[in-house]
Amino acid sequence: MIILLLSIIIFILYIVKIFKNKSCCGNEIILPPGPISLPFIGNLHQLAIDPHLAIQKLMFKYGNVMTVYFANIKTVVISDPNYLKEVFVNQSHKTSDRYLMGTSRIIGNEKDILFSNGQYWKNYRQILAQSFLKLRDHKGITEKISLESVKLSQAFEWYATSGQVVNPCSLFKMYTLNVIMQLLYSHRSSYDLKGQHPIIDALKMVEESLAVGNVLDLFPILNIFLKKNKLKLVNNLQQVWSYSQDSIKEHREKLLINPEKIDDLLDLFINEIKLSKNSEFFDDEGLYRVCSDLLLSGTETSSSTMSWLLLFLINNPNFQDKVRTELLEATGGKKTIGLTEKSKTPFFNACIKEALRIRPVGALSLPRIASEDVTCGPYTIEKGSQIIMNVYGLAMDPTVWEDPETFNPYRWLSSDISQSTYSFIPFGCGSRVCVGSSLARDEIFLGIGNILLNYIFESQNGKPINEKGHFGIALQTVDYNVKLTKI
């Protein structure tokens, strides 16, 4: 009897939900269309595997603004550049906040930069933007990235001389982590597994936990059965936080002795907070969580883009040869390149942009929440809805990009390229656009540029590498091995 009653209640709620979400006419609001969702799971049966590709298929049926349900979370997916501008730029006061769930609250406690909202986020965003701006003017910072890119190139040498294959993705992760650690704390780790910094294992474990964490966010009831995963995430985050806390203490002690000795981003953070009119607003918890955010997000995004770029250059050896020739001309035959030569390498720059376009690591962006009803063309996005930018869908739009699924750097060199600014947003758009985007481009340019000057890369078996990838905390390549020849 109880089961029958529950079934009837679920059926009634399901019918009410269907009618509630149908588009309305007349004086009533019109909601974005979308596929029928099921009780409890929503549209997860359609989205669970490769959600960026699944949404792409649904988009062709329901349009560039559609509603889907991640379990019971109403989500509006936007795949149109004009609507993106309307929603995230023109109405940024309604769409700047993050959609927060269990995992994001554990990571940020609403006191970091990725997963905080309101005035708190605005204050830290301002400090971060000012610090990054001053960082770019600091000569020693550029030298740190350049030297790290040389060390990355040296890390490949053993594989070239021994004839052993190597998974470049793991070396790229070490490179991007070292760049962030150098810029943030003036620390670095060895590329040798035996000499690696203990924080590296903790960061890897956090990444693994986050993949399962998404499931716990959608179905909180599973926390009862997956307590170990949550505990594992917290324990590894504690290691990252402790490392950041120790570094903050170390930097403060140094600045007390010599306030003028600015070596890195953390020094700039501490100084900017002192100069801020809201200095009493910032506490140590916020500072160590912001620093930890940079370690977590800055490492994965740039390393994934480097892995994609090398993959496409291996699958297109003529492009790889052309890039190498251009780099050698720019350096006058030298085997190292710096940022001063960046303006001399238009084709290589185009390859970087094309990798960012064709495989954006933030394929579906970090979700926002509509803090009020939001207008999106003829539709209304209701208050409380989750909103996602379909970055991948924008990049695959055949009305904007000719042959969008083909890696073609020449599209960026064409004089008649006229796509909307919001058709290419690998670093997001609006008030939450990535403040470290220029830095990321520089680290990709130097890292890939210096290895291409020293080695020829081929796939392990001479066949093209799988270009599909997989969807995790970022859109990543499958692990692949390469052969390399020293030049």
Curated annotation (Swiss-Prot):
The keyword Membrane applies. GO terms for biological process: organic acid metabolic process; xenobiotic metabolic process. Keywords: Heme, Iron, Membrane, Metal-binding, Monooxygenase, Oxidoreductase, Transmembrane, Transmembrane helix. It is a single-pass membrane protein. It is found in: Membrane. The keyword Heme applies. It is an enzyme of class 1 (oxidoreductase). One of its GO terms (cellular component) is intracellular membrane-bounded organelle. One of its GO terms (molecular function) is heme binding. Its cofactor is heme. Its EC number is 1.14.-.-. Its main location: membrane. Belongs to the cytochrome P450 family. This is Probable cytochrome P450 516A1. It comes from Dictyostelium discoideum. The lineage of its organism: Eukaryota, Amoebozoa, Evosea, Eumycetozoa, Dictyostelia. The gene is cyp516A1.
